[in-house]
Amino acid sequence: MAAEQRRSTIFDIVSKCIVQSVLRDISINSEYIESKAKQLCYCPASKKESVINGIYNCCESNIEIMDKEQLLKILDNLRCHSAHVCNATDFWRLYNSLKRFTHTTAFFNTCKPTILATLNTLITLILSNKLLYAAEMVEYLENQLDSSNKSMSQELAELLEMKYALINLVQYRILPMIIGEPIIVAGFSGKEPISDYSAEVERLMELPVKTDIVNTTYDFLARKGIDTSNNIAEYIAGLKIEEIEKVEKYLPEVISTIANSNIIKNKKSIFPANINDKQIMECSRMLDTSEKYSKGYKTDGAVTSPLTGNNTITTFIPISASDMQKFTILEYLYIMRVMANNVKKKNVGKNNGGVVMHINSPFKVINLPKC
């Protein structure tokens, strides 16, 4: 029996974004292409051609172009994807040929079979290039973080370095773009432009973790009419870096009236008299949940957010199909790959000629000098 191909949750999300961004303005059910796209991560070289041919065949069978105006709209969307095609000459040959077919309606109608074949090839070219680039970067990231050939101290250090590197990526790059604020440059003012991309990413990783950008984003969402009352996800994810000083501040508003309310003596609690049993149970449940997360008892990694419908990537507000599904998603993946490489170089062990000593610690070993 053939071994089951490894799957990547990250790539499942990324590939769906890529497919939907490329097929925007095209009347086609993208589910089959999305299912094929997911197979390109950890895909043996012998199977890639079959998967890509499956994508082309789906396009060939389902894509219809009614008029030249529709074709022009599709081409306007596809133009920006040229940056992620390894052979730009191929891209522009197909793209410019399709442009020529929009010269007159009669010419368009006469050449429609050729137009469809050309468009299907262009779409397949873009999808296969972007998906393979994304798969390579996701594979690198996951293999770097999941590598078993590490000491526990190195693994812990790398996971924490990567966690806060991603937090800075969100705070200094993604959130400012979403709310329309200028992106902060990682380099110091007065310095010459950084030619080494790795050095630029390194400086991004070294920027302060505590910023006001999350609060600024909440203000932005509030002005747009988005409910921001449930922000537990940002605390759990470690993005909203704040110390909670008073529990009452983060409980439902009714708890804040405790100081001005009469205490229910027979219930031996500090709840005001106008709170019913259902509200008391809800407050108790919230406290229990918070305690489990704060003490590490609940470590399932599940995170929900008021910024999403908690269903699919397409329900993001206000990101939706505007940012995550643009071609820039590959730029974010590339930044993450460079981050992972920088973290690896920073934490790789060097041979210092010492002696490895086994100790009764979860970290198991330490290095000592030869004496």
From Swiss-Prot:
The keyword Cytoplasm does not apply. Late protein which is a part of a large complex required for early virion morphogenesis. This complex participates in the formation of virosomes and the incorporation of virosomal contents into nascent immature virions. Keywords: Host cytoplasm, Phosphoprotein, Virion. Induction: Expressed in the late phase of the viral replicative cycle. Its main location: host cell. The record marks G187, F188, G238, L239 as: Cleavage. Phosphorylated on serines by F10 kinase, phosphorylation state is regulated by H1 phosphatase. Undergoes proteolytic processing during morphogenesis, probably required for the transformation of immature virions (IV) into mature virions (MV). GO terms for cellular component: host cell cytoplasm; virion component. It comes from Vaccinia virus (strain Copenhagen) (VACV). Pfam families: Pox_G7. This is Assembly protein G7. It is found in: Host cytoplasm; Virion. Part of a complex composed of A30, G7, F10 kinase, A15, D2, D3, and J1. Belongs to the chordopoxvirinae G7 family. InterPro entries: Poxvirus_G7.
